[in-house]
């Protein structure tokens, strides 16, 4: 059983200022480098650099408690844009190999999104300028971590897509990557899915992508494609073929009779796409075929 003095000491410890708290404190006294604030028991420094407005005529001030660069408990009037109870979009400011990415939460110190909350492959980790939907966790030692929202949390932002979005372009932020595809949320809350077959490469977590709606689903979400429309792709593929031919003095040992594997290895396109592009070039009088070769018309 605790003695009265031991119980008071425990209660005092429970009530003491800790990193991660948002408190309203009284102004104790001013110094050249800031103000000392108090909760009636302990004092803490609010440095001039951490003030967002003049508090000379005030008795109390709302602050966030954190551990500064010198590992000291300190106060700031800059309130973080996310908290343990509130998720929000935060911007990536740095990426550290084998450690994670740091995000700006509105304080002079950034919060870490650890590797356990990031994809297994670093090439699809967020880069500077990308955004993640996170909450804030502050340890007793003052380390700040940002944790991306799980599906059940981010689903609170979802809105239903309308049928008239079919074939329209949507832009959004990649918020989840799994083996079966990429999930995106638009600024107005439409949930989008990109199957691996509808992209040339996997987008980064937190990056902005623009895709074409290829299906509006019954649950209000949509499927997106990041691939160009066939007519646009044909133009790109045709230019690729012409560029290759011009590197070989206007001739290449490929035609619409070439093997699919040979075409894919050389041009990174399917035989169907190759034939469409080649047909487009022949129709427009750019090339002709002869004995299994294709030649550029001069």
UniProtKB/Swiss-Prot annotation:
Residues 1-22 are annotated as: Disordered. Gene3D superfamilies: Nucleic acid-binding proteins (2.40.50.140), Winged helix-like DNA-binding domain superfamily/Winged helix DNA-binding domain (1.10.10.10). It comes from the Bacteria. InterPro entries: CvfB_fam, CvfB_S1_2nd, CvfB_S1_3rd, CvfB_S1_st, CvfB_WH, NA-bd_OB-fold, S1_domain, WH-like_DNA-bd_sf. Signal peptide: none annotated. It holds the Pfam family CvfB_1st. Residues 1-17 have a biased composition (Basic and acidic residues). One of its GO terms (molecular function) is nucleic acid binding. Residues 167-227 form the S1 motif domain. PANTHER family: CONSERVED VIRULENCE FACTOR B. This is Uncharacterized protein YitL. The lineage of its organism: Bacteria, Bacillati, Bacillota, Bacilli, Bacillales.
């Amino acid at each position: 059983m605790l003695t009265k003095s031991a119980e008071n000491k425990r209660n005092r410890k429970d009530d003491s200022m800790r990193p991660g708290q948002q408190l309203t404190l009284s102004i104790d006294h001013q110094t050249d480098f800031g103000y000392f604030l108090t909760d009636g028991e302990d004092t803490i420094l609010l440095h001039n650099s951490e003030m967002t407005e003049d508090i000379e005529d005030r008795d109390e001030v709302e602050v966030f408690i954190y551990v500064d660069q010198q590992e000291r408990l300190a106060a700031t009037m800059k309130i973080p844009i996310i908290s343990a109870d509130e998720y929000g979009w935060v911007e990536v400011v740095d990426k550290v190999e084998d450690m994670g990415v740091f995000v700006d939460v509105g304080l002079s110190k950034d919060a870490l999104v650890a590797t356990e909350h990031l994809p297994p492959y670093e090439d699809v980790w967020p880069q500077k300028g990308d955004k993640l939907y996170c909450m804030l966790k502050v340890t007793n030692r003052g380390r700040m971590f940002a944790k991306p929202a799980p599906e059940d949390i981010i689903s609170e932002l979802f809105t239903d897509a309308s049928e008239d979005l079919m074939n329209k372009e949507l832009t959004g932020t990649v918020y989840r990557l799994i083996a079966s595809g990429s999930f995106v949320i638009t600024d107005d809350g439409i949930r989008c899915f990109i199957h691996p077959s509808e992209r040339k490469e996997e987008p980064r977590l937190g990056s902005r992508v623009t895709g074409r709606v290829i299906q509006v689903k019954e649950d209000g979400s949509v499927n997106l494609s990041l691939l160009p429309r066939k007519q646009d792709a044909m133009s790109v593929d045709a230019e690729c073929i012409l560029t290759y031919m011009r590197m070989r003095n206007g001739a290449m040992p490929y035609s619409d009779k070439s093997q699919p594997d040979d075409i894919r290895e050389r041009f990174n396109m399917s035989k169907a796409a190759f034939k469409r592009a080649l047909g487009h070039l022949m129709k427009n009088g750019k090339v002709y075929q002869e004995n299994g070769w294709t030649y550029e018309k001069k």
